[in-house]
Amino acid sequence: VRGDGDGWAFSDTGVRFWGRHGAAGLLLRAPRPDGIRTVLLQHRAWWSHQGGTWALPGGARDSHETAEQAAIREAQEEAGLPADRIVVRAAVVTASASGTSWTYTTVVADADELLPVVPNRESTELRWVPEHDVAALPLHPGFAASWESLRGLRLPG
């Protein structure tokens, strides 16, 4: 689905960032039946920007959306996640582009259990990954830069 946010934004140094109005991703956490904490990761399709890396379901924000709305919409599109099973806990700006208003916001959310997922064409795979195994994967550089601080967040609820 194309929205008015699809397209590149450019920093004052010429570096490009996806999302004309910024971008957002969903860090969805859920316990396995054995209690191990997991997060849902997307193995990005090879044709996509930074293809072949693991990251969060997410993408460009449209002009009328909050970061939370964009992250949940993208997770529905890319993973088939039901919005009514997701509880948003926080929104954290984890990247910005020099000289612009562009930001990437990670929306941290919880689900009571591992939810079934259905990948779209933007994913090679979707996987619930134990938190302690995330850093061992070939991560998208932006997600890699923020993972440890996101993992360390302790939120009420």
Q: Where in the sequence are the language-model features?
A:
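N-terminal leader/linker segments that precede catalytic domains of diphosphate-processing enzymes
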Residues: 1-53, 59-114, 155-157
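NUDIX/MutT-family hydrolases
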Residues: 106, 117-151
